[in-house]
Amino acid sequence: MDVNPILLFLKVPAQNAISTTFPYTGDPPYSHGTGTGYTMDTVNRTHQYSERGKWTTNTETGAPQLNPIDGPLPEDNEPSGYAQTDCVLEAMAFLEESHPGIFENSCIETMEVVQQTRVDKLTQGRQTYDWTLNRNQPAATALANTIEVFRSNGLTANESGRLIDFLKDVMESMDKEEIEITTHFQRKRRVRDNVTKKMVTQRTIGKRKQRLNKRSYLIRALTLNTMTKDAERGKLKRRAIATPGMQIRGFVYFVETLARSICEKLEQSGLPVGGNEKKAKLANVVRKMMTNSQDTEISFTITGDNTKWNENQNPRMFLAMITYITRTQPEWFRNVLSIAPIMFSNKMARLGKGYMFESKSMKLRTQIPAEMLANIDLKYFNDSTRKKIEKIRPLLIDGTASLSPGMMMGMFNMLSTVLGVSILNLGQKRYTKTTYWWDGLQSSDDFALIVNAPNHEGIQAGVDRFYRTCKLLGINMSKKKSYINRTGTFEFTSFFYRYGFVANFSMELPSFGVSGINESADMSIGVTVIKNNMINNDLGPATAQMALQLFIKDYRYTYRCHRGDTQIQTRRSFEIKKLWEQTRSKAGLLVSDGGPNLYNIRNLHIPEVCLKWELMDEDYQGRLCNPLNPFVSHKEIESVNNAVMMPAHGPAKNMEYDAVATTHSWIPKRNRSILNTSQRGILEDEQMYQRCCNLFEKFFPSSSYRRPVGISSMVEAMVSRARIDARIDFESGRIKKEEFTEIMKICSTIEELRRQK
């Protein structure tokens, strides 16, 4: 399609063309190799920003720790992490004064959550550092391994199923002199294959017990594993992100619950809302500042950028905030909430896989694991790496680096937002006590600041005061990257505001196209994305129609399901043509079976099966929606499914789409190669969980699914449920006396076996 791109912009206002400058088409960059270098950068930078703090040594782990809190006040514009405790506490007090009861109410809400949350909350989330195996695992597996180790070491509070009880075990585990864990390992041996008579390598998986002393266990419990952040657009350099272990996660969850509850009550907070709700919140603040500045005042807005937000934040400051916020609350609650920041003050960063070396002349490759960096000869490294290693060496213990100052990415988004909002709150005239005043928006490290004043000097003074206030709380507004405009034009969290929000359509580009789940889900997701963009992102009818046609084309090429009457030859065309010829009502065939596309922009909300149902041949209906079809392994499909969309910025979003179960909703089988690796034990565990959960679901079908209340194990819940159901069935005559007696006997046997165990 040859279009002169200039033509596209003839009628477009300049501000709407902003989205064409975004780096969102094509594949995002991914990282390859190890993240060790990026992690060392993070650790070294963080220490540099706090270098004038006080050094101490952790008595338990022997880790050297740097504490910049209440350090020297900055004399230049360089980023620094010297937050002042009294300033932070005062900012909190003023925040509470402007919002009476906000902390009290949020604490009460959080206390309820703390008492009700179950351990399985921690199974959400993707990769988690598994301290028992010293590497990353899916969250559910990491949690299971942790609980298994706890129980074998006599820590059993977690059996109640409440998260708070699991956390009691975590606390107790840290006092134990030693902890015994089970690790997986691989044995390789060379054997001769009976058939081919060649030598092959045979792998066997073993489990062995290992004892960790208190120091080693504490180091693991406080470790954050690091990885490289993938798919970041518009950056030349990659950066490291952290994933904490199960000991830290539960505590962080409660702190963030409290902070989220506070953020919900703050009009300047861009979290936890998103999308249109966030835009409405934003527009309100702008409107407030514009209305108050009509005649006498001028109003300017800074599109703000902070330098290295995470690396200058400090867990000790968060501890001070929590201590203040919960000051009127019961002791147990204050203790639970203060543990996360204390653990972060003592955190260790795992350096990842280490470095790969290869010798061109000898065709050799070897991996230098992170553990060896402490004492390897540095002559093998290039200059920049050598400098990094020299700098980090004093901090190393067992391949992890002591990292007391700074927060790793994404850990306390809500709480750090509360800190940012507390500065915006200080912009009211009753606090500035002068002619200028400010307000704004904060969302994690991103902010927009609106300053009003009678003249330009006032604006400048206001910005300066804001900048210096930030410095006192360990926040560094970047003078190079922030820019100021007349109010009415600014950007905040990639929303562009120009007398109202301009749709930044380019950010949605990556989600257009075929997702690659299966034929049924992909069709549904594809049209839902187009529908959502018509609702939220100014996608006009003509463009939407074109997007739809391109999507169908893309879909047909992906699944090789071109129309039955086409000339295109693919691997499937023989079957599809045959189906086309024997179908009476060809309009009823799904696109994935070579049928025509009946979608247009008016009916995007209807699942394709429903759209075509009346047009289908009867035998086609029978084949399409037949749960007994032997060629399909069905999972039970909810009426609404969730796809994980990767928008251009921010976390992966859950997108709902309608799902109708057909023979096209297949699930690919698991790759076999995993069965030969040390992951195999984990896979078997997962299957066991799956079976247990399926069994549980049979006893508590979703229609009557209430979580068993009170403290009972899954087995106890199922046995008592079986007894109740059996009695009802017997009394209503649905089962005979013999069957009833047999069920009761089985239940008693199960209980007896449990007692003996």
Curated annotation (Swiss-Prot):
Residues 249-256 are annotated as: Promoter-binding site. PROSITE patterns: RDRP_SSRNA_NEG_SEG. A motif (Nuclear localization signal) lies at residues 187-195, 203-216. One of its GO terms (biological process) is viral transcription. Residues 52-81 are annotated as: Disordered. GO terms for molecular function: nucleotide binding; RNA binding; RNA-directed RNA polymerase activity. It catalyses: RNA(n) + a ribonucleoside 5'-triphosphate = RNA(n+1) + diphosphate. GO terms for cellular component: host cell cytoplasm; host cell nucleus. Residues 55-64 have a biased composition (Polar residues). Residues 286-483 form the RdRp catalytic domain. It is found in: Host nucleus; Host cytoplasm. The keyword Phosphoprotein applies. Pfam families: Flu_PB1. Its EC number is 2.7.7.48. Keywords: Eukaryotic host gene expression shutoff by virus, Eukaryotic host transcription shutoff by virus, Host cytoplasm, Host gene expression shutoff by virus, Host nucleus, Host-virus interaction, Inhibition of host RNA polymerase II by virus, Nucleotide-binding, Nucleotidyltransferase, Phosphoprotein, RNA-directed RNA polymerase, Transferase, Viral RNA replication, Viral transcription. Phosphorylated by host PRKCA. RNA-dependent RNA polymerase which is responsible for replication and transcription of virus RNA segments. The transcription of viral mRNAs occurs by a unique mechanism called cap-snatching. 5' methylated caps of cellular mRNAs are cleaved after 10-13 nucleotides by PA. In turn, these short capped RNAs are used as primers by PB1 for transcription of viral mRNAs. During virus replication, PB1 initiates RNA synthesis and copy vRNA into complementary RNA (cRNA) which in turn serves as a template for the production of more vRNAs. Belongs to the influenza viruses polymerase PB1 family. Influenza RNA polymerase is composed of three subunits: PB1, PB2 and PA. Interacts (via N-terminus) with PA (via C-terminus). Interacts (via C-terminus) with PB2 (via N-terminus); this interaction is essential for transcription initiation. Interacts (via C-terminus) with human PKP2 (via N-terminus); the interaction competitively inhibits the interaction between the RNA polymerase subunits PB1 and PB2. This is RNA-directed RNA polymerase catalytic subunit. It comes from Influenza A virus (strain A/USA:Huston/AA/1945 H1N1). The lineage of its organism: Viruses, Riboviria, Orthornavirae, Negarnaviricota, Polyploviricotina. The gene is PB1.
